[in-house]
Amino acid sequence: MGNTQRESVFEPEFRSDLQYWAKNDRKILLKIFDLIEAVMREPLDGIGKPEPLRHKSTSTWSRRITKEHRIVYKVSAEKINFVQARYNY
């Protein structure tokens, strides 16, 4: 799955979360950008302790931003939908 080029889609909530971090904590925003790059390279492995979300569809994953906050994304063969970047799922 790793070397497939996928389209990245930022859902409205995810974009809103990025705006929040841009205003409130640029260090976290930069970490989110690092996580986005890692997800695009290898969606199911890498930094941030990737894990599937059991209560969602099998294609929904999360990675740790901080102890409190997670990035949540959905993986398909064609694209990766970034869903949220604040709070826990």
Regions found by a protein language model. Give the residues of each.
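A short, surface-exposed loop/turn module that caps and links secondary-structure elements
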Residues: E37-R64
